[in-house]
Amino acid sequence: MEPDFWHARWQTKQIQGFHEGKANAFLVKHFPRLPVAPGARVFVPLCGKTRDIAWLLGEGFRVAGAELSRIAVEELFAELGVVPEVTTQGAHTRFSAPGLDIFQGDIFALTPDTLGPVDAVWDRAALVALPKDMRARYAPHLVALTDTAPQLLVCFEYDQPLLAGPPFSVPPEETRTLYGADYVVAAIDTAPVPGGLKGQCEAVEHVWLLERA
């Protein structure tokens, strides 16, 4: 999956299945399970312009995000009503405001030194955005990037041949394979997707709590 795919998606606003108009219900319900307190820094990979960031900031957390599309990052700050400071940091463009840093560029080129320390990860739309071969690269990269910070992870599961993706189906056994060596992987919630995924096929969402092994 090439970067041009996602740039085109944002240019044409084809972000169904990823962007929600309000904070994710699983985030609101389960974020207190993570061992972090207000003031902690939360990493949101492949963040787009998610409203989850506004919710996290409103709860007193600091947020770092990574996003490929400059359009998405600019729309995020516009919707937050914040004018960012824009600088170049390593291979990325950094958009900064009080309590918020978004690194625009390839997440696989993001380094721990550039990102800085984080205390937790909220992954609702990153792992599922990637095809299987890229998920096998992404998971260990995220673990190294965040120094095995605890994660709250949401994955779709559906009959993959019925829908090309993204978002892709990530069945529970794959989640355990990807993260089981580094984390205690606990399933904490599951729910059907109302109306099906993109209205095309039945799907469920699985919520996982990943804590250091």
Swiss-Prot record:
Keywords: Cytoplasm, Methyltransferase, S-adenosyl-L-methionine, Transferase. It is an enzyme of class 2 (transferase). Gene3D superfamilies: Vaccinia Virus protein VP39. It is found in: Cytoplasm. It comes from the Bacteria. S-adenosyl-L-methionine binds at residues 10, 46, 67, 124. GO terms for biological process: methylation; response to metal ion. GO terms for molecular function: thiopurine S-methyltransferase activity. It catalyses: S-adenosyl-L-methionine + a thiopurine = S-adenosyl-L-homocysteine + a thiopurine S-methylether. The keyword Lipid biosynthesis does not apply. Its EC number is 2.1.1.67. GO terms for cellular component: cytoplasm. Coiled coil: none annotated. Belongs to the class I-like SAM-binding methyltransferase superfamily. TPMT family. NCBIfam families: TMPT_Se_Te (TIGR03840). This is Thiopurine S-methyltransferase. The lineage of its organism: Bacteria, Pseudomonadati, Pseudomonadota, Alphaproteobacteria, Hyphomicrobiales. The gene is tpm.
